[in-house]
Amino acid sequence: MSTASSSSSQTPHSAPQRMRRSTAGSPPAAAGSGTGPAGSCAPAAGAGRLLQPIRATVPYQLLRGSQHSPTRPAAAATAAAALGSLSGPGGARGPSPSSPTPPPAAAPAEQAPRAKGRPRRSPESRRRSSSPERRSPGSPVCRVDRPKSQHIRTSSTIRRTSSLDTITGPYLTGQWPRDPHVHYPSCMRDKATQTPSCWAEEGAEKRSHQRSASWGSADQLKEIAKLRQQLQRSKQSSRHSKEKDRQSPLHGNHITISHTQAIGSRSVPMPLSNISVPKSSVSRVPCNVEGISPELEKVFIKENNGKEEVSKPLDIPDGRRAPLPAHYRSSSTRSIDTQTPSVQERSSSCSSHSPCVSPFCPPESQDGSPCSTEDLLYDRDKDSGSSSPLPKYASSPKPNNSYMFKREPPEGCERVKVFEEMASRQPISAPLFSCPDKNKVNFIPTGSAFCPVKLLGPLLPASDLMLKNSPNSGQSSALATLTVEQLSSRVSFTSLSDDTSTADSLEPSAQQPSQQQQLLQDLQVEEHVSTQNYVMI
């Protein structure tokens, strides 16, 4: 062991080999080494042995290394195995490797029967659990503890963090590193696909606000009660002011009276029904009213008590109270910004006691009614007496307000008159269908529909040509062939009725043109009779 200690002091880098040799040593020899300089410093810490907490100080790696030792006796191996099984519930009593106060080393004669009888502690494990600072630098156990603690730390750090190559490689390619050992509280996010976190916070705030409003906290119930009281008071004051407007014969003095009464009862109430405020900001309205109302009380009370003439110009733009004169009724002098509806029943939702005091209402929209534009259109239609649903500012080309829905051509295009061009083309194209070809037929018009024709060939082809080129273009070529066959059949029928020979029956075919004209007229007058005759034959 002296040679081992000297060699270990000379070569400090061969510490893992010394760990296996120290575990392979016999118990008396290892106990004998405790009588050296390390054993001299051990009794100094005997008083602090009972104050140490119960800790499992034998790691799994030392137990695994002790199983592979070839020269260790069986008793020490079984004791170490039993100590490993009891290390969880507190079988090993000793400080951690970094503790500065080691337990005292007992005598080797007492340690050997304890290791055999009770598997409490072995002398090597007790000596191994002591701190390396109190040991001599030449002892082999001191060389064992340092690489053991370093190995445990490096293994734990490798589990928690990934190496530098795994971080820089995907990071330079544009991908975020994903370490499987580290458990993040949320899933991995990419900046290109995720929205800002403030959006999610705003959505959560909105959701929580709606939920608290639905369940109703104490502050919100108070605000709702205040809103209801203000609405009721505004309705009552509007009713009183309307009754006074109807009863009072004056046009301007009762305005200030209603002002003073409304202010004397309470601060100027604000009608919330006329303000288009979202639901989330309704809860903020009482704070604004309470902050503005003391200043308004001072201003209006001072003006009404001192000078009534000062408050009158303030109420002139608000024209709901006094009826409009007759010359104001013309629709040409009205506009939405300057006029208000004259019918009081239609503006019943309007407030009629004070100009708008909330910061939500601009001074241009002091009429407060949500249907002011509809009232204006209604009054215009009522004044002009027209029942047309279209507004008056539409362009009407005719004096009787009948609208011609014509679309103007776009810029750079000409207006095309479609119907006039079609009407001009029709008389030109109509005679082309009824005129016969002058190259084929020569006729002399006598005023009748059927004209005498100069035959250029034999009888039957000439009559066929004449019937095809007749002015009655509605007859088809089948009808023309039908009439030719009827003519020949009539000639043959008359010849057969005379009981003449077949040679004599060919003679009536060469009769005079006067007989042919009579036959043609008979055919045209009695068409239906001729069709029946043709069917019978």
Curated annotation (Swiss-Prot):
Ranges in a coiled coil: 217-244
Residue ranges with Basic and acidic residues bias: 121-136, 178-192, 309-321
Skewed-composition ranges (Polar residues): 329-346
Ranges where the record places region Disordered: 1-45, 62-254, 309-407, 495-520
Record GO cellular component, one term: cytoplasm
Protein's UniProt name: Glucocorticoid-induced transcript 1 protein
A Pfam family it matches: FAM117
Species per Swiss-Prot/TrEMBL record: Mus musculus
Compositionally biased intervals (Low complexity): 69-86, 152-168, 347-359
Residue numbers carrying Phosphothreonine: T101, T166, T168, T256, T333, T340
InterPro entries: Glcci1/FAM117 (IPR026642)
Tissues with expression: Predominantly expressed in thymus and testis, especially in CD4+CD8+ cells and at specific stages of spermatogenesis.
PANTHER family named among the record's database cross-references: AGAP011572-PA (PTHR14972), GLUCOCORTICOID-INDUCED TRANSCRIPT 1 PROTEIN (PTHR14972:SF3)
